Swiss-Prot record:
Residues 9-172 form the Exonuclease domain. This is Oligoribonuclease. It comes from Actinobacillus pleuropneumoniae serotype 5b (strain L20). Keywords: Cytoplasm, Exonuclease, Hydrolase, Nuclease. Disulfide bonds: none annotated. 3'-to-5' exoribonuclease specific for small oligoribonucleotides. The active site is at 130. It is found in: Cytoplasm. Its EC number is 3.1.15.-. InterPro entries: Exonuclease_RNaseT/DNA_pol3, Oligoribonuclease, RNaseH-like_sf, RNaseH_sf.
């Protein structure tokens, strides 16, 4: 049972064929909704976008290796979903939990994801509040102010969108307790 709430947070992660939205495309989108205290309320659909073999063959060696090992390239080839279909399915899920414009975009390095959303999924980009809740900001502050903390939180780095979101939420919980020193 969904619960529409202005305080709920939308976590998103994209996997792309590269880092340049002028040349690269989105290949996977996942979302999770948490309450304000970072408790997971719902996991959205993990959606794979079909892209051409030509585009996939132009990916960097790192992308080809990573997305072959995690199975994403094969799922992209098998998918029948367009970027627009993925965008609409994601928005339909989010509407159950968070009103449009209420939640900042949450995750790690979300400015990069937002660049791709503006280019290829503008309605989804517009669903978010203009603010960002970027876990990588705390990571950068910890790197400068408390570097010994960085090795205390280990990520698996599967480069699968849903796994990455779960890790981002856990990472923010870690920083909340050990860096910001707020107990929940």
């Amino acid at each position: 049972m969904s619960k529409l709430d202005n305080q709920n947070l939308i976590w998103i992660d994209l996997e792309m064929t590269g880092l340049d939205p002028e040349k690269e495309r989105i290949i996977e989108v996942a979302t999770i909704v948490t309450d304000k205290d970072l408790n997971i309320l719902a996991e959205g659909p993990v959606l794979t976008v079909h892209q051409s073999n030509d585009l996939l063959n132009k990916m960097s060696d790192w992308c080809i290796k990573t997305h072959t090992e995690n199975g994403l390239i094969e799922r992209v080839k098998q998918s029948k979903l367009t970027e627009r279909a993925v965008e609409l399915q994601t928005i339909d899920f989010l509407k159950q939990w968070v009103p449009k414009g209420a939640s900042p975009i949450c995750g790690n390095s979300v400015a990069q994801d937002k660049r791709f959303l503006y280019k290829y999924m503008p309605d989804l980009a517009d669903y978010f509040h203009y603010r960002h809740l970027d876990v990588s900001t705390l990571k950068e502050l910890a790197r400068r102010w408390k570097p010994d903390m960085l090795n205390a939180f280990n990520k698996k780095n599967t480069h699968l969108a849903l796994d990455d979101i779960r890790e981002s939420i856990e990472e923010l919980k870690f920083y909340r307790t050990h860096f910001i020193n707020l107990e929940k």
